[in-house]
Amino acid sequence: MPGLVVFRRRWSVGSDDLVVPGAFLLAIHFISFVLVAVSLVLFEYNTSVLSVKLLFYHLISYLLILFFSICVEIGICVISMRGSILDSEARTSINIWIYLKSLVILFDISWLILGSIWLSNYYMEAPIDEAKKIFIAIIICNWTLVFITLITIWCTFDAAGRSWVKMKKYQRSMRETESRFNYKRSNSMNRNWRQRKVMRAYQDSWDHRCRLLFCCMGSSERNRNSFTDIARLLSDFFRELDVVPSDVVAGLVLLRKFQRLEREAIVRQRKNGTYEFLSGVPITEHTQFLALNDAKNYDFFQTVIHYMYFAQGAYGWPMYVIINRSKMWHLVPELKCFGCCCGSGDDSQVIQDNCCYCNYAALKKTLQLGDIDIVYATYHVDVGETPFFVAVDYTQKKIVISIRGTLSMKDILTDLNAEGEVLPLQPPRDDWLGHKGMVQAAIYIRNKLQQENLIERALQRNAERSTHTFDLVLVGHSLGAGTAAILAILLKPEHPTLQCFSYSPPGGLLSMPAVEYSKSFITSVVLGKDVVPRIGLNQMEALRADLINAIQRSVDPKWKTISCSVICCGCGPEPTSVVNMSGQDTHINQYQEERGTARSTSAHPTDSSIALTLHQPLYPPGRIIHIVRHHPKPDENVLKNREPVYQAIWADSTDFDEVLISPVMLQDHMPDKVLAALKKVISDVDDERTSVNSCSTAS
């Protein structure tokens, strides 16, 4: 950080990122140098033979090229290791070494071309077998290196890099002029024109990346509009963020350690009455644990677990196979290509499943926990159009609509379309905003329910069992959770008694007025440090500021910072900035102040910078049950040794305003992990009851 500027343009790589590629090339070229030198010393070359003479001169030339390559690569590695992440002045001379390396590469390619010509013309007739075998191996190896180098250059190419350099040069000249003459020039029109030009270039670049990444999806009008919206969002988010991917990695490593130190300091100081943290959540005397000893709460929690099976079943056969690796053969009898021979009398309507109805088979296997009748299941998927199914749950006497979460590239596009959009209500409420992609998905499902008359069909499914009296329940996980919550709000006027269970919903889902309204009928479930409920656009802007603040505090080279988290499973030496903060409340308080200042600066940038678009905060829906882990200490008396105890607490929507960096931040989002954690909460409560009863009996 910042991005390397060579050849009059910015690149998506930092001057301190060249240590690893430089060391890799150095190792390969050193081995090649040894092989060539050994072949020149050991083998006798009869220069009276033209083919041997040409080979000898080729090897001598390449030995010189390798020598210069090794020298330049040593220089690049040494220079690249200098200074901290932000101290690019210590690496200013890296540009000269890159230009030298580029020149050496040109000589290398020229030599490879001549060597390839020699192979095509003289390889068969050259009477020196061992030397020419080494020669062809070196040729192949170096062509491979050239190909890898070109791929790397293509990956680090910044399409808007030249415009960026011009804009920065202009801003620098403006600041120098203002400083020299001690006045501020009003030249906003020219400045804004340059900024718009850069932003347009970056938006086009992101649009191109989206089209390349999702090239298999076709180029429909809906997809093109989605690409444009996402490109605008991403270019806006990364505006004037002069970082490269490795900076983000180093920032995440530091931020995780800073967050841990901050939590330790809060507990040590008993700030706000906090006496411990569970899964990153501050626990105080006011924390509301779900009282599962109460029969009503216990039954409600069992209902939460019950409907998690519906949310998991919507994922179809991929999730079933992941969860049941040793039992996936159980699906075979349920497949259509086999089941049709057995005279299956299933009258469910299944839309756009695969040829063997694998998804529907997995759904039926997942829902074998009660008396459940599947009425309708669609696996059609497009941008803003999510698969779902409708079922009659005779066990709970409910009509269940379950919506699938993210599973395809089209689902990812729906997720990324994260701008706020007004919910389509009658009468309209301008302050009720929702995640744009999920609003579109909810409208699609609502229209489908109305066009196919699905809710009415489910209510009339079995008059003898009074299905017409059943209430409506909406469930979903991840993308499905967000869509289900918005759909519940849309259907609430027509179905006043409906309920919604939203598992691992996205953080940037609803504006606060809509969240407050939803608390009476939506229950959300979040596991541990799950990142998805914490990554709304507003939270991402805070994360952006926190990463920059963490990087600014770093005094170590980037390679050392990153290696601290990977050497010996994270057992390497701690970064210097972390060591300086450890146990020092003054330094931690200073860090907190700097973090607040960084967030404020991000929200209110200076006039000379490219202002960020401020996004209205969006939050997870409804009342939130947060499943947290308590890792027992060695001196604690626990029921199961070394196993964390899972507990459920009531959380507020505003509690998920910060991304917690953790190895489990992605794992905690998986539906099977959520279901397992919910069951462990009940299991731990049951074990505690059994232990108490045993003690009472013994006494």
Give, region by region, the residue ranges found by the protein language model.
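Non-catalytic, mobile gating and regulatory segments of ester bond hydrolases
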Residues: 2-475, 479-699
